[in-house]
Design a protein with these regions (language model features):
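Alpha-helical interface subdomain recognition
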Residues: 1-115
């Protein structure tokens, strides 16, 4: 995988995304007590997408081994569990679509989406 330029680029993107989340978390800590609702909503959306993409990257690095099970009857590997759990990150605490609507309506003051 380290010889694949696309995998290397995705690893770099994941590292950068992690650094972005760290800086944003530190910035939010610095402004404790302030109204950070918009930032919190954006952070949740960013994190859930980052985590999902990182799980997909892990599966792509494993290649065909990502589809193998460890033992009978059916035991997922740690990476397989992580990948499947990361998919849920985009759903619980509000799906990404709902998060985008909330960011637009509450954070940016856009008109409500017709229901």
């Amino acid at each position: 995988a380290s010889n694949d330029p696309l995998i290397r680029q995705r690893l770099a993107d994941a590292w950068i995304g992690l650094k972005v989340m760290r800086v944003n978390a530190l910035r939010m800590l610095e402004h404790q007590g302030a109204d950070l609702n918009r930032e919190a909503l954006i952070s949740k959306l960013y994190w859930s997408n980052w985590h999902r993409d990182l799980g997909k990257l892990a599966m792509d690095i494993l290649g065909n081994e990502a589809e193998l099970i460890e033992s009978a009857p059916y035991e997922l590997t740690r990476m397989q569990k992580w990948y499947l759990f990361a998919r849920a990150d985009t759903i619980y605490a509000g799906s990404n679509q709902i998060q985008r609507n909330i960011i637009g309506e509450r954070g940016l003051g856009l008109p409500k989406e017709p229901r």
